[in-house]
Regions:
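A short linear boundary/processing microfeature
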Residues: 27, 91-95
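Active-site-flanking beta-strand signature of metal-NTP-handling nucleotidyl enzymes
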Residues: 4-11, 74-76
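Hydrophobic C-terminal alpha-helix "anchor/cap" residues
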Residues: 29-32
Length: 117
């Protein structure tokens, strides 16, 4: 939605912790949806790559066959404005930062800004 405020997080999950992470994100996402101004929340697990295929030719991505170092997950969180985003982010850190840290190989990355489309 144009004029909303969005965030993308990258989580690099320890391979042996993926089931625990996926269980936790069900709880996190439910709470995120309840935050004031939340328009959307999605989580994606990276299963595919374009390595060895050509997307310019219409080739589909190939499925990943092994885990190297970590399993990557992305979240996309959209809120109606940056003030509600700030409050929601505080809620997220207060409730899940420590629990998530135990499952990751490094702190998660956050990229945020005004939505342009």
């Amino acid at each position: 939605m144009k004029d909303s405020f969005s965030e993308v997080k990258l989580f690099q999950v320890k391979p042996e912790k993926t089931a625990e992470f996926e269980s936790l994100i069900l709880s996190i996402a439910a709470g995120q949806k309840e935050q004031q101004g939340c328009l959307d929340i999605k989580y994606v697990k990276r299963f595919f790559t374009f390595y060895d295929s050509d997307p310019h030719l219409g080739d589909p991505p190939r499925e990943l066959t092994k885990i190297v170092k970590c399993v990557k997950y992305f979240s996309y969180w959209e809120l109606n404005n940056k003030e509600n985003y700030g409050k929601a982010t505080k809620w997220f850190f207060d409730n899940y930062e420590k629990e998530l840290a135990k499952l990751l190989i490094a702190p998660f990355d956050i990229h945020c800004g005004n939505s342009v489309y």
